Swiss-Prot record:
This is HPr kinase/phosphorylase. Mg(2+) binds at S158, E200. Residues 199-208 are annotated as: Important for the catalytic mechanism of both phosphorylation and dephosphorylation. The keyword Ubl conjugation does not apply. Its EC number is 2.7.11.-, 2.7.4.-. It comes from Staphylococcus saprophyticus subsp. saprophyticus (strain ATCC 15305 / DSM 20229 / NCIMB 8711 / NCTC 7292 / S-41).
């Protein structure tokens, strides 16, 4: 549960009053700058959001008649409001301090500029309040691409990850990957604290990757871009040999590119994953070798067809 207290500690904010409300839960990632509310319009006041008061809001408030000030601040401070933050180290009005104290609404000050603080708070809240799920697999950073390796138990996911680590890539999580949907089409993965930096190898046991290979071999968190699904080779199954078939893996409401790699003796899966990651980066840059080959093949078929028609005439 994310509370106002954790926000104060994270951004080193100063609490002026309303300490009793520091345990309030923050449920909304949106942040408000109550400009219209300062003017007296509270019909659509989003009171469950964190409220930011900067130079603009307080300058307007100071222009209000004395008889309106107290009522305006009482309407602003609601029991469900997680916090009111005054930015730029500005002095909170006395009416605001009194209203916050009455309603046990945390009144906080910050030295940071309003826009900058709003951006930092939004990023933090989106990360902390994001939808989460867990998947069985291994997450590795390969050439800057977050690769989620999945497959049946015993297929060789951890062994493949170990080979990738030896080749200079970085482990994020093994066995259990905690995934957050930060925003639309953006997933990040990390390891649970209990198994952070650990890798399980059958017959060998649990190893500490950071201790064995150094700090450069691990990564705390990585955005998921590519799913490599390992499965035993089936003779009757037709595998993609050109690269035109586009598979996706849906996690929460986001889809990522998926490649199914058949596993059998003699195949170096780690190298295949390296190439898959590099090829994915090329695709993002607009270079698709499979499509180029397909266009070249179609052009050759068309040329041969026209040549045959000419000979028949």
């Amino acid at each position: 549960m994310l509370t106002t207290q954790s926000l104060v500690e994270r951004f080193k904010l100063e609490v002026i009053t309303g300490e009793a409300g520091l345990n309030k839960q923050i449920k909304n990632t949106d942040i408000s700058r109550p400009g219209l509310e300062m003017a007296g319009y509270f019909s659509h006041y989003a009171s469950d959001r964190i409220q930011l008061l900067g130079t603009t809001e307080l300058s307007f408030y100071n222009l209000l008649p004395d008889e309106e000030r107290k009522g305006r601040m009482r309407k602003l401070c609601r029991p469900e409001t997680p916090a009111i933050i005054v930015t730029r180290d500005l002095e909170p009005p006395e009416e605001l301090i009194e209203a916050a104290k009455e309603n046990e609404t945390p009144l906080i000050t910050s030295t940071i500029a309003t826009t900058q603080l709003m951006s930092r708070l939004t990023t933090f809240l989106e990360h902390e309040l994001a939808r989460t799920t867990s998947l069985h697999g291994v997450l590795v950073d390969v050439y800057g691409v977050g690769v989620l390796i999945t497959g049946d138990s015993g297929i060789g996911k951890s062994e493949t990850a170990l080979e990738l680590i030896k080749r200079g890539h970085r482990l994020v999580a093994d066995d259990n990957v905690e995934i957050r949907e930060i925003s639309k089409d953006e997933l990040t993965g990390r390891a649970p604290k209990l198994i952070e930096h650990l890798l399980e190898i059958r017959g060998l046991g649990i190893i500490n990757v950071m201790t064995l290979f150094g700090a450069g071999s691990i990564l705390t968190e990585k955005r998921l871009r590519l799913n490599i699904h390992l499965e035993n080779w089936h003779k009757e199954k037709l595998y993609d040999r050109v690269g035109l078939n586009e598979e996706t893996l849906r996690i929460l409401d986001t889809e990522i590119t998926k490649k199914t790699i058949p596993v059998r003796p003699g195949r170096n899966v780690a190298v295949i994953i390296e190439v898959a990651a590099m090829n994915y980066r090329l695709n993002i840059m607009g270079i698709n070798t499979a499509e180029e080959f397909n266009e070249r093949l179609n052009a050759e078929i068309l040329r041969n067809g026209n040549h045959s028609e000419g000979n028949n005439q």
